[in-house]
């Protein structure tokens, strides 16, 4: 402190009376003070070089684990991208010259240039699937049916059958002439079998009239039981009408049954009772079939042997 005061006094004296010469002792004291101050300033900015005192740099702890997860995720995405690229290159065959398997046109047409293996095809609204001109469009199912479906309408092509399911009907027409070949719109078009179709197999048919060509017969065949029912009657007309069945024939009508023409019944096919049976024995009720002169058929219950058709309540009137 004394040295500092002396230096300050000397400075003031030098500033007021001009430069003052210092002694050797004063110069040594001043030099020592300067070195001491310099050393103290150097130590103030000194940092010990110890591992524990250094600032830790880099990703450590949770940040390091998160960085590893991000790197692994990027690696997985790169592998998936590589697999997708290989599939696109192998299936679509995209190369330096373009795509070898398909073509994209400005009109929106997608053309396949080779055999394509697909599962389900969903065309867009009002789209068309077709083949090239003068070439067939071949659609093949590998041990599976080929199904064309739009809403509730479905066309299924299987190995042994082809089925069409529709709630509103169907029609077939020539794509070139647009002539209707077959239609189920009975109110507008009469039902005709297409050319080459000889038989129609249905479980149930509701129609006003069933006819055949003038040069062919109309045959109705069933494996089990056939029921022909009309809301206002059933009329069967033909040159010759034959019924062949292995079981019973049942004719029911609310008013009457009219057989107009020659009616032939083969007695060899009719069941007959044994000659030894009594007329009144057992639970059987027997009837005799009788005919009037005008062709009216009626039945008479058999109550005794050698009984004829002459009964009082027969519908023939005076003529039997």
Curated annotation (Swiss-Prot):
Residues 89-320 are extracellular. Disulfide bonds are present. Keywords: Cell membrane, Cytoplasm, Cytoskeleton, Disulfide bond, Glycoprotein, Membrane, Signal-anchor, Transmembrane, Transmembrane helix. Residues 1-67 are cytoplasmic. InterPro entries: Sarcoglycan (IPR006875), Sgcb (IPR027659). Disulfide bonds join 290-316, 292-309. One of its GO terms (cellular component) is sarcoglycan complex. Residues 1-34 are annotated as: Disordered. The keyword Glycoprotein applies. It is a single-pass type II membrane protein. It comes from the Eukaryota. Most strongly expressed in skeletal and heart muscle. Also detected in proliferating myoblasts. One of its GO terms (biological process) is response to glucose. It is found in: Cell membrane, Sarcolemma; Cytoplasm, Cytoskeleton. Pfam families: Sarcoglycan_1. Residues 23-34 have a biased composition (Basic and acidic residues). Component of the sarcoglycan complex, a subcomplex of the dystrophin-glycoprotein complex which forms a link between the F-actin cytoskeleton and the extracellular matrix. Belongs to the sarcoglycan beta/delta/gamma/zeta family. This is Beta-sarcoglycan. It comes from Mus musculus. The lineage of its organism: Eukaryota, Metazoa, Chordata, Craniata, Vertebrata.
């Amino acid at each position: 402190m004394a040295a500092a005061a002396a230096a300050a006094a000397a400075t003031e004296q030098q500033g007021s009376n001009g430069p003052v010469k210092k002694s050797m002792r004063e110069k040594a004291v001043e030099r020592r003070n300067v070195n001491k101050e310099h050393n103290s300033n150097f130590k103030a900015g000194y940092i010990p070089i110890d591992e524990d005192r250094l600032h830790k740099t880099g990703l450590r702890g949770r940040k390091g684990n998160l960085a590893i997860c991000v790197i692994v995720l990027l690696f997985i995405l790169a592998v998936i991208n590589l697999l997708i690229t290989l599939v696109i290159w192998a299936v679509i065959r995209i190369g330096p010259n373009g795509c070898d398997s398909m073509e994209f046109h400005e009109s929106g047409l997608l053309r396949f240039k080779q055999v394509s293996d697909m599962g389900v095809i969903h065309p867009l609204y009002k789209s068309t699937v077709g083949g090239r001109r003068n070439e067939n469009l071949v659609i093949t199912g590998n041990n599976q049916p080929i199904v064309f479906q739009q809403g509730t309408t479905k066309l299924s092509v299987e190995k042994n059958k082809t089925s069409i399911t529709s709630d509103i009907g169907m029609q077939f027409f020539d794509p070139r002439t647009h002539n209707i070949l077959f239609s189920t719109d009975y109110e507008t078009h009469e039902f005709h079998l297409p050319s080459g179709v000889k038989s129609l197999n249905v479980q149930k048919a509701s129609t006003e009239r069933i006819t055949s060509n003038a040069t062919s017969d109309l045959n109705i065949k069933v494996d089990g039981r056939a029921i022909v029912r009309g809301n206002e009657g059933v009329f069967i007309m033909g040159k010759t009408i034959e019924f062949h069945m292995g079981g019973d024939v049942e004719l029911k009508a609310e008013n009457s049954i009219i057989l107009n023409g020659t009616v032939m019944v083969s007695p060899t096919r009719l069941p007959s009772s044994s000659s030894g049976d009594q007329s009144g024995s057992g639970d059987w009720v027997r009837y005799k079939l009788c005919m009037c002169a005008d062709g009216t058929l009626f039945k008479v219950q058999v109550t005794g042997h050698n009984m004829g058709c002459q009964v009082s309540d027969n519908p023939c009137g005076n003529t039997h």
